[in-house]
Each structure stands twice: as structure tokens, then as C-alpha cells.
């Protein structure tokens, strides 16, 4: 629905259906497997509207009753260090988003700025937890956790000059908190949740990225483009165990991470042929996954792509 160029409104509905089937181990040894299947059905809905407050300044507001269906890995694991649960339920959440964006062009210059706030009330949150395995190894399991409340914001900006320069970045802060006041104790009774209002473990909550892009158009021949891109990603340190339980939280921290990448691409004949070379983490920083396991260091990639057809 678009009553005018100044504002519009839309409503929508979604139907989710998931059917999965595959072998599941009957015990921890994995000596015997049985074929298991499951079907999940869910309905979602929402509404969104936009309004131009001033020329170039737009407000956006949306609400959605959303579902996140479990992934194959969350249901079946990876037959190595990930243990799945075929009975895991979809996440249910009420999501509210409010955004303000401003765009303007003057001469060869263009500016775009956007900021937004997020509110998400989630039930049956799908959580990835650590478990001890034999031989001193650790693995992961997936469970539904009762209630989780997310409040956050994000800011992004981009500047362009003519057709040869683009600079931009994003910053995000997501406060993901345990919103379950009570939990089931070891004897089956209801007890106070010591992690209530604490950050959900193993979830990054502050991160940012930045990129600079240079373009040389019609280089050596009309329709060819050479582009050079520098980008980086920053992630603030976070805990992969509950910070509300235990006294040595620093032992379970994923440290700050800041990586840098460089990409060189050359496109020929209006994009029909493309060659690119990329160096990821070219400063060889120490990078980690969500369980503080170190990732590979500096890496080089090359890619050739050919577009067939008109």
C-alpha cells in the first residue's frame, strides 16, 4: 500500500514448513543409527511502514512475529564435535525495529547515514552450549532456552565521490540477556535462575566493520573496471560461559579481534569476465571462533568468473 510518495504501509504473513529426515545415533557411542524424520509448521506475520519526515530523511518502523527454523546441524549435528537434537523447537520472537536514514547528493558527492534500534523478545531460543567429551575434548550441543531479551542499536554511514570512491562502515551493539527468572532444578522443582539478566554466553555483542573502495573505470579498454578494496572487521571480547556463574570469567573469554583484508578485482567487457585476488587477514592477527579456538592466519584466494549469455 503506497498512498503517497511521502509514506507507505504494508502487512504480510508467512507460512513456515520444514520436513527433515536422516539417520540419528541411538547412543553416545554412535554404534547404531535409526532413520528419523520430523515436520514443523509455523505461521508468522508482521507490518512495516515508512515516512519521509523531510526530503532525504526517512523513518521506518516494523513489527514481525517471526520464527527461526532449526538448521540441519542443530538437529543432526556434524558427526564429529557437534551433537544435534531432532526434537529442538523453532525460535519464536516478537521483533520491533525503528530506523532513521538520511541520503543526499551534491555535485560529485553522495552521503548516506542510517541508525536504528532493535527490540526482540525471544522464546525457545536455540542456544549452542559446550559439553565435555572423552579424551579431554569439548563439543557442542543445541538446546531450547526459555526466554531471551535483545535490545540493541546499529549505525552505518557511507560516502561516495563520483564513480571512483566509496567509503563506509557499520557499528552494532546488541545486548542479548537471559530473561528467564526461574528454572527447573535438579530435583524437578522451580528455582531462581542465577543467570537472570546476564548476557547470553557465546554471543558477540559489539562489532564493527569499515571499507574503502577505489574504482578505475574504462581502464585500458571501455567497459573494463579495476577495483581495489580494503576492509576490516572488529569484534569486542565476549565470554563463552555464563558470566553470572563461576569466579574466573577471564578464563572463558574470546579476546578482542581486529582483522584486515585486501581485494583486487578486474572486470572486462562490462562484467562478462572477472578476475579477483584476495588476501584475508593480511596482518596475520590472532582470530578465534565463538569457543576461543584459533582460526587460520593469513590466507590468499583467487577467483575467475565468466558470465555466459547476453
What annotation goes with each model-predicted range?
Residues 5, 113, 118-121, 141-239:
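Gram-negative outer-membrane beta-barrel transporters
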Residues 9-11, 45, 59-61, 111-115, ...:
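Transmembrane beta-strands of outer-membrane beta-barrel proteins
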Residues 50-52, 56-64, 90-151:
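Membrane-embedded beta-barrel scaffold of Gram-negative outer-membrane proteins
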Residues 15-21, 63-69, 76-78, 104, ...:
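Transmembrane beta-strands of outer-membrane beta-barrel pores
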Residues 67, 123, 167, 228, ...:
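C-terminal beta-signal and adjacent terminal beta-strands/loops
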Residues 2-7, 54-56, 105-112, 164, ...:
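Short loop/turn motifs that connect adjacent beta-strands in outer-membrane beta-barrel proteins
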Residues 1, 43-47, 59, 84, ...:
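Hydrophobic, lipid-facing positions within transmembrane beta-strands of outer-membrane proteins
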Amino acid at each position: 500500500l503506497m498512498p503517497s510518495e511521502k509514506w507507505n504501509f504494508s502487512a504480510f504473513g508467512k507460512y513456515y514448513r520444514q520436513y527433515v529426515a536422516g539417520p540419528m545415533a541411538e547412543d553416545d557411542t554412535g554404534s547404531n543409527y535409526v532413520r528419523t524424520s520430523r515436520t514443523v509448521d509455523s505461521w508468522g506475520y508482521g507490518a512495516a511502514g515508512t515516512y519521509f519526515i523531510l526530503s532525504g530523511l526517512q523513518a521506518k518502523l516494523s513489527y514481525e512475529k517471526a520464527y527461526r527454523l532449526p538448521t540441519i546441524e542443530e538437529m543432526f549435528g556434524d558427526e564429529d564435535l557437534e551433537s544435534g537434537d531432532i526434537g529442538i523447537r523453532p525460535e519464536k520472537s516478537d521483533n520491533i525495529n525503528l530506523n532513521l536514514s538520511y541520503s543526499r547528493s551534491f555535485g560529485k558527492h553522495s552521503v548516506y547515514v542510517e541508525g536504528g534500534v532493535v527490540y526482540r523478545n525471544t522464546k525457545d531460543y536455540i542456544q549452542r552450549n559446550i559439553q565435555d567429551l572423552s579424551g579431554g575434548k569439548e563439543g557442542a550441543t543445541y538446546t531450547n532456552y526459555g526466554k531471551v531479551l535483545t535490545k540493541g542499536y546499529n549505525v552505518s554511514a557511507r560516502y561516495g565521490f563520483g564513480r571512483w570512491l566509496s567509503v563506509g562502515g557499520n557499528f552494532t551493539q546488541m545486548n542479548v540477556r537471559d530473561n528467564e527468572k526461574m528454572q527447573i532444578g535438579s530435583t524437578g522443582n522451580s528455582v531462581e535462575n542465577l543467570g537472570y539478566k546476564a548476557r547470553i554466553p557465546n554471543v558477540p555483542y559489539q562489532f564493527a566493520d569499515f571499507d574503502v573502495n577505489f574504482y578505475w573505470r574504462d581502464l585500458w579498454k571501455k567497459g573494463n573496471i579495476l577495483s581495489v578494496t580494503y576492509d576490516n572487521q572488529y569484534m569486542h571480547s565476549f565470554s563463552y560461559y555464563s558470566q553470572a556463574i563461576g569466579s574466573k570469567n577471564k578464563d572463558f573469554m574470546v579476546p578482542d579481534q581486529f582483522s584486515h583484508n585486501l581485494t583486487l578485482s578486474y572486470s572486462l567487457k562490462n562484467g562478462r569476465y572477472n578476475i579477483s585476488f584476495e588476501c584475508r587477514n593480511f596482518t596475520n592477527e590472532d582470530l578465534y571462533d565463538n569457543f576461543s579456538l584459533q582460526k587460520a592466519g593469513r590466507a590468499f584466494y583467487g577467483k575467475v568468473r565468466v558470465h555466459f549469455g547476453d
